[in-house]
Regions:
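Acidic/His- and Gly-rich active-site-bordering loop/insert found
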Residues: 2-101, 105, 109-126
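Histidine/acidic-residue-rich, glycine-tolerant segments that coordinate divalent metal ions
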Residues: 82, 89-99, 123-199
C-alpha cells in the first residue's frame, strides 16, 4: 500500500464519508442505546464484505486482513452521543433530543472509510486489523464492556489506535497532532481526593 495511493483513494471516498457522517448525525443514540447507529454500522460493514460481530452490549467488531502473518492492530471509533437538544440550523440536524456534540459521528464515519480502504487492500496487509466500534464512551463504560466480552482476544490485539476530532483548538483545519509513543489519550476514570486541614 503506497501512501500516495491511499491518499488518492481516501479523497475519492471523501463525499461518501461526509454523507455517512451526516446520516449518523441525524440519528444519535446515547450510552448503550444506539440501535440506529449500530444497525447502520453493521450494514455498511457487511456491504463492504466484512463480517460484523457483536461485542458486549452494543459494540461491534470486524476483522480485515489475516491472510498473511503479522500482528493484530486495533482501530477504534466511539459511536454514542450526548443527551443534548441540537439547535444547529443545518439540514442534517438531530431531531430526537440527543446530539453528536463531541464528533463521534465523524469518528464512526472515518472508521467506516478506513475499513473500505483496508478492505480494498486486504491482500497487502501483513497481519490483521481489528475494527472496534464502541458504545457508551460518554459514560465511561463502553470500552470496559467490550473488553470484558473478549475484545482484546481472538485474535489477541498487539497495539491500538484511536483518534478524536478537536473543535475549538488553535490549529488550522486538516492538522493532525501525533503524540509520543505509548499511552496518550486521557483516561475516562474516577478518582477520590481527601483533603485534611483546619477550616
Amino acid at each position: 500500500m503506497k501512501p500516495e495511493t491511499l491518499l488518492r483513494e481516501a479523497n475519492e471516498i471523501q463525499s461518501q464519508i461526509l454523507s455517512e457522517r451526516r446520516t449518523l448525525h441525524q440519528c444519535p443514540g446515547t450510552d448503550f442505546d444506539i440501535g440506529e447507529t449500530l444497525a447502520f454500522v453493521k450494514k455498511e460493514l457487511a456491504d463492504m464484505g466484512l463480517q460484523p460481530v457483536d461485542c458486549g452490549r452494543a459494540g461491534v467488531v470486524a476483522l480485515v486482513g489475516g491472510k498473511r502473518p503479522g500482528k493484530v492492530f486495533l482501530l477504534r471509533a466511539d459511536m454514542d452521543a450526548l443527551p443534548i437538544r441540537e439547535e444547529a440550523d443545518v439540514d442534517f440536524a438531530s431531531q430526537n433530543g440527543r446530539m453528536h456534540a463531541c464528533g463521534h459521528d465523524l469518528h464512526t464515519a472515518m472508521l467506516l472509510g478506513a475499513a473500505r480502504l483496508l478492505k480494498a487492500h486486504e491482500n497487502e496487509i501483513d497481519g490483521t486489523v481489528k475494527l472496534m466500534f464502541q458504545p457508551a464512551e460518554e459514560i465511561f463504560e463502553g470500552s470496559h464492556d467490550m473488553i470484558e466480552a473478549g475484545l482484546l482476544e481472538n485474535p489477541k490485539v498487539d497495539a491500538a489506535l484511536m483518534i478524536h476530532v478537536m473543535a475549538g483548538m488553535p490549529f488550522p483545519a486538516g492538522t493532525v497532532i501525533v503524540s509520543a509513543p505509548g499511552v496518550s489519550a486521557p483516561a475516562a476514570d474516577y478518582f477520590e481526593i481527601k483533603v485534611q486541614g483546619k477550616g
